[in-house]
C-alpha cells in the first residue's frame, strides 16, 4: 500500500471527478491521501472531504503565495482548526521567492506562526520552499531552538546542502513526480541519499504529473509511478519502498488512522 502524502483534492482538475480520482488511486494501490489546504477558505472543504472518506485526511494552513491575504491570521485560528479529528497536519506553509506573490517579511511571519502551532499541537508542519533555501533553513533552525516540532519538506527540489541541513534538524523529505523528469539529475542523486526512515512520496496533484503521464492532470494514482521510479533509483523493490514510506507516514502523521 502507498500513501499520497500531499495532494489537493479540492483543486480544479480533481474536484470535478473526485470520486473517480479516488477510485482510480485505490485501484492503483493507494490506501491513504493527505489533502492539503492553501487558503483559510479551503479548510472547511478539505475537512468535509476527510469526513466523508475514511482514507483521506486534512491539513490546515496558508501557502506562502497567500500570505498577504492572510497577514492578520492568528495562531488561534489555526489551533482551533486542528481540534477537528480529521486534521492531521499544519500547512502547507513556508517561503516562495520564485514568484514573490506575497511580501517576503509577511511570508516569514506567517511561517513562524505555523511553526508555533505545529510545536503546540505536535502535528507535522508541511513546508513549501522555492528559491528560499537560506531563509527557510535559518527559520527552521531558529525555531527548533525554541522547542522541537515535527516537520517535512514537501515536493523536494532543493540542493543537497539544504537536504543535509533539514535532515540534521530531524525533518522528513517528500519526493514528488519531479524526480522522474529527464532533467532532474540532481534531485535523482539526492533522492538516493535520503535515509529510508525519513522519506515520503507524494503527487502534489493536480500538478507535476510524473513520467509517463507528463502533460496530463496529475492524479493521486500516479504516486505509484513515482514510487516505482524512486525504488529503482534506490535499488530496492517497489514493495519495499511502499512499505517503508507508508510506515514513515504513519509515524509522522500519528493522528491519521486507517
Question: For the regions a protein language model found, what residue spans apply to each?
Answer:
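Mid-domain alpha/beta scaffold segments of enzyme catalytic cores
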Residues: 1-258
Amino acid at each position: 500500500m502507498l500513501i499520497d502524502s500531499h495532494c489537493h483534492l479540492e483543486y480544479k482538475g480533481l474536484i470535478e471527478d473526485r470520486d473517480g480520482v479516488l477510485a482510480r488511486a485505490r485501484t492503483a494501490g493507494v490506501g491513504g491521501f493527505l489533502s492539503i489546504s492553501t487558503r483559510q477558505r479551503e479548510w472547511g472543504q478539505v475537512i468535509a472531504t476527510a469526513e466523508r472518506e475514511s482514507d483521506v485526511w486534512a491539513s490546515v494552513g496558508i501557502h506562502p503565495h497567500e500570505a498577504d491575504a492572510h497577514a492578520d491570521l492568528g495562531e488561534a485560528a489555526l489551533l482551533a482548526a486542528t481540534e477537528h479529528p480529521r486534521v492531521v497536519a499544519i500547512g502547507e506553509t513556508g517561503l516562495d521567492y520564485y514568484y514573490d506573490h506575497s511580501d517576503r517579511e509577511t511570508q516569514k511571519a506567517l511561517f513562524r506562526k505555523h511553526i508555533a502551532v505545529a510545536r503546540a499541537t505536535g502535528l507535522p508542519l508541511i513546508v513549501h520552499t522555492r528559491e528560499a533555501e537560506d531563509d527557510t533553513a535559518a527559520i527552521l533552525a531558529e525555531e527548533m531552538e525554541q522547542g522541537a516540532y515535527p516537520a517535512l519538506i514537501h515536493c523536494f527540489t532543493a540542493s543537497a546542502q539544504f537536504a543535509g541541513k533539514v535532515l540534521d534538524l530531524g525533518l522528513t523529505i517528500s519526493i514528488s513526480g519531479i524526480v522522474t523528469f529527464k532533467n532532474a539529475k540532481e534531485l535523482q542523486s539526492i533522492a538516493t541519499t535520503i535515509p529510508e526512515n525519513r522519506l515520503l512520496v507524494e503527487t502534489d496533484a493536480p500538478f507535476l504529473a510524473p513520467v509517463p503521464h507528463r502533460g496530463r492532470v496529475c492524479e493521486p494514482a500516479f504516486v505509484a509511478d513515482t514510487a516505482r521510479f524512486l525504488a529503482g533509483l534506490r535499488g530496492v523493490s517497489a514493495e519495499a519502498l511502499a512499505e517503508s514510506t507508508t510506515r514513515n507516514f504513519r509515524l509522522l502523521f500519528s493522528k491519521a488512522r486507517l
